[in-house]
């Protein structure tokens, strides 16, 4: 991403040496890309993939804004989500980063961990936030109508945040003085819940024990988040200048909204608040507030 003049962020990399940090950003937009056939006159200007191979390629109008970065990027073609062919072509956002055979028709839905969360398991302990999960519609949506592209190790959808101010406050606004007390209370509540669950487990059938174990796994993940928050609570938050940002922006102003969301991701990376981010720009099937974003911004 380019350096946005909106921000004057402290350089988090200065204290970490000169070794570039590896970051992962995954972005999803719905409804496909233009793929005109070679005999179609539109193929020259509007084919999604550049013409040519290796370094000797030419962008079409789809990607020509990336021309200044051509020596720093790789466009990959020829890949396929084979498991996605078993479901409707506009119902597979939930497979975008998991590539899981989620089931179709009468088969029971089952997903798996997404690429971003797998990477976050390796680098997430080095930053305040293991990952940043965002979308335009927010939340999780429904099966085949996902509002998120991030899934935990059990294949459960991770709710996405779509409110710029909420994202900014989470990243850069200091917690109140009661934060330590609330974290201690959360830890105590989780400890009691785990103790009660172990007693309950002795009275359950094998099937119910499996269901309880899945639930307890979520509780343990919450416990890990609480422990991590306690470790970072005395670490100062990055200092940023967002005076020129409109954090109350909504998708009703799509161009500014998208710019703001991408600027937040840039700033999260720049300050090393996280090294993993996902953003579902819109959802499939013409449902939700993001349906007309591309049309609105031209």
Model-derived segments and spans:
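Ligand-binding pockets and gating/stacking loops
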Residues: 1-298
């Amino acid at each position: 991403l380019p350096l946005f003049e909106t921000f004057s962020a402290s350089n988090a990399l200065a204290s970490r040496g000169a070794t570039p940090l590896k970051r992962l950003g995954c972005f999803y937009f719905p409804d496909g890309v233009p793929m005109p056939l070679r005999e179609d006159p539109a193929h020259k200007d509007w084919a999604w993939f550049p013409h040519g191979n290796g370094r000797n390629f030419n962008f079409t109008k789809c990607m020509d804004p990336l021309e200044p970065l051509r020596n720093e990027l790789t466009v990959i073609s020829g890949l396929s989500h084979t498991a996605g062919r078993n479901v409707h072509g506009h119902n597979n956002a939930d497979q975008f980063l998991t590539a899981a055979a989620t089931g179709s028709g009468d088969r029971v839905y089952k997903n798996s961990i997404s690429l971003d969360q797998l990477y976050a398991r390796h680098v997430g302990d080095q930053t305040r936030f293991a990952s940043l999960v965002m979308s335009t519609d927010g939340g999780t949506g429904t099966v085949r109508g996902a509002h998120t592209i991030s899934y935990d190790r059990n294949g459960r959808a991770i709710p996405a945040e779509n409110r710029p101010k909420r994202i900014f406050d989470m990243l850069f606004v200091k917690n109140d003085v009661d934060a330590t007390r609330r974290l201690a209370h959360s830890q105590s509540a989780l400890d009691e819940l785990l103790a009660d669950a172990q007693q309950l487990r002795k009275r359950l059938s094998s099937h119910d024990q499996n269901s309880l174990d899945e639930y307890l796994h979520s509780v343990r993940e919450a416990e890990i988040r609480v422990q991590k928050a306690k470790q970072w609570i005395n670490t100062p938050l990055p200092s940023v200048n967002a005076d020129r940002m409109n954090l109350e922006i909504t998708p009703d102003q799509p161009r500014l909204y998208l710019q703001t969301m991408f600027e937040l991701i840039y700033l999260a990376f720049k300050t090393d608040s996280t090294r993993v981010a996902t953003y579902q720009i819109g959802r499939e099937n013409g449902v939700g507030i993001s349906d007309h974003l591309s049309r609105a911004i031209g």
